[in-house]
Amino acid sequence: MAIGLTTVSAQRGMRVKKNVPLDSIRLSDPAILADQKTKMYYMTGTGGMMWRSADLKLWEGPMRVTEFEADSWMGARPMIWAAELHQTGDGWYYYFATFTNQAVIIDTVRGNAIERRASQVLRADSPMGPYRAFGDATYLPANRPTLDGTYWKDKDGKPYMVFCGEWLQNWNGTMEKIELKPDLSGTIGEPKVLFRASDSPWSREKNDKGEITWNKVTDGPYLFRTGTGRLGMLWTSWVFDVYTQGVAYSESGTLDGPWVQEPEPITPPGYGHSMLFQRFDGQWMMSVHHHSKDDHGRTVRIPHLFEVDLSGDKLIIKL
């Protein structure tokens, strides 16, 4: 049985704070929904918490907005990564996220135990939730670790989930698509690979022989169209130990590509896993996190906003 939202918050001793500056929040993979109905911005990401703001400057949170059934594959308390909210015009708010059940091992590759991890869609009738599972028990193959699912409606009018096949199992991360049911309650057919980590001209790592090669990580896809109608995809990998974001463009204007990678990263070093949204004044924004180490060697991830220009043939960040 699912535990009520208020009960969960009380059990975990959550304290909601107000008037918190954006750069005081610690959050990976920040995704922002600008909700026209409430005239509020809602920020999700890794950790399963929600923040909200009227002006993108001062925020209220964190608030837990998800509920889970203990008998689902995710379990009662899954790890939650890279949550993002989408609207399709049907009145519902859809919560695309990556869920991990650490109690279930699906594979062992090169000595690494692969936990049960997959992208899934939850739904609520309010941006504040509670978001619950509403459709098929699974959206993606149970024998594969998948992550960072996002939503896109392609030129064929069909909805799709674009997601990553995790490098921990395939050692050459993939970017893939799968068709969603019209009401997003499940998937149709099999996934299709759009491109692989090895297609990147800018990512870097050292292989087992000490040779410099492409990095095997694919992370954080997000789809957009430019003012000229060109289809682009933001995605993230690494340049050695620096989190780095690139962009690819589809030559066909559809998810099927072929996808051509831009030769250089699109954001400064240390920024990645972004998405795009429009402010209420119409300005396009990029929500991204900065990935760095503090004085004690601990990883710190801080949300950051860039203004972007989509009016031309390419996405341009206003630095």
List PLM regions with ranges.
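Carbohydrate-active catalytic/glycan-binding domains of CAZyme proteins
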Residues: V8-L319
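Bacterial N-terminal signal peptides
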Residues: M1-G4
